[in-house]
């Protein structure tokens, strides 16, 4: 599900469909406009009650976007990408605080965090930075699961069909 207004993941999937015409792709991407909170809540409740499997949802990065509360409240897991740089860590901390307040207001909310470092390159980082990154991950473990670092060069991964 692509809930983000820019619909980047949906657009990328449309390109894939054209590029791999006639090939059965292993998953679909559907766009969804989240402006109407009631529509979001109804859609996710129906999905949660009637679908067996995994649904990945891309959401806007702006926490003031209408429709985000039911997405987070009805999710089992919240995958939170971050980078080892000050602005990203600060934004991640703000997001953790937002979700904590939401969980306090909605005790039925049982979402769990999975933190995934984005654009990590094992070739970079001085000793002090590496220690800081380790401490950052240790701190994040207080709030959820920290996925192992996966080296990447950024952008989208290429999948061969």
Regions found by a protein language model. Give the residues of each.
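Beta-strand-loop-alpha "switch" segments that mediate conformational coupling across diverse proteins
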Residues: 120-161
């Amino acid at each position: 599900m692509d809930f983000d207004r820019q619909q980047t993941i949906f657009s990328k999937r449309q390109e894939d469909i054209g590029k791999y015409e006639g090939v059965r792709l292993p998953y679909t991407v559907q766009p969804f406009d989240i402006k109407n909170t009631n529509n979001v809540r109804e859609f996710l409740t129906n999905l949660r009650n009637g679908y067996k499997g995994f649904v990945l949802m891309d959401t806007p990065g702006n926490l003031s976007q209408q429709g985000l509360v039911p997405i987070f409240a009805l999710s089992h897991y919240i995958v939170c990408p971050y980078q080892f740089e000050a602005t990203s860590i600060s934004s991640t901390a703000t997001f953790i605080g937002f979700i904590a307040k939401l969980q306090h207001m909605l005790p039925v909310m049982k979402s769990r965090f999975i933190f995934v470092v984005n654009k990590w390159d094992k070739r970079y980082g001085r000793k002090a930075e590496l220690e800081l990154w380790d401490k950052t991950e240790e701190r994040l473990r207080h709030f959820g699961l920290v996925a192992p670092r996966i080296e990447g060069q950024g952008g989208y991964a290429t999948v061969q069909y």
